[in-house]
Amino acid sequence: METSKIERFVFETQDDWKGFRKGLFTSSQMNRLMASPTKKEIELGERLSKGAKTYILELISNVEAEPKKEFYSSAMEWGNEQEPQAVLRLAEMLGKDVTDNDFIYTSIGGFVFFVYDKKSGGTPDVILSDAIVEIKCPDSHTHRYYRTFVNSDNISVELPDYYDQMQHNMMLCQKDTCLFMSFDPRYKEAKKQVHLIEVKADKIRQEQILEKIELAHEQKEAWLLL
């Protein structure tokens, strides 16, 4: 990803942030672009999967139509509520303070958003001097699964959607490392409340992501003319 094509924006309100990003492919949805076409689709010359095309159409409708009302499940609300506490725990674990210059919590002081070539964008939860951080606050049983089965070696297979999210954000922030943090304060033992995994930049996957972004952008621009 060319550094000269990366832009950083800070929005005062969440509505401004949402409005700006609604026509862009985002890190959190990147895995939808990465799905491989079926054998039949490939035989027909298709390079984007049905799921990827559905995502493209969703972005187009976000631009051309009135936005639909957002729905927040209890799990999503829980995650949003616990994230600040997770950030504080992370800072403590790293010997940092949330006000340190090399510990940037991207939801404080405005909504940060990185954009690549006006085509895709994303924001990690925390930016460190040498890494970014992606924080998840899942249900307790999911957190336990992560702690038991997910590690640096298999996260690309176990959590492919988060893996692609992190790879895209690493490119946007020009970092070679991402810390994946799962946090659940409901566990009685403090050490069981946190699961931290170091994920390295996967240059091959990152190139594949960039290729899919270009393909999807071309398709989106063509469909916008219809």
Description of each model-found segment:
Residues 94-217, 221:
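Nucleic-acid nuclease catalytic cores
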Residues 52-56, 82, 86, 165, ...:
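Alpha-helical structural motif
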Residues 76-100:
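Acidic-basic catalytic patches of nuclease active cores, encompassing PD-(D/E)XK
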Residues 1, 30, 34, 76, ...:
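Detector for methionine-enriched segments
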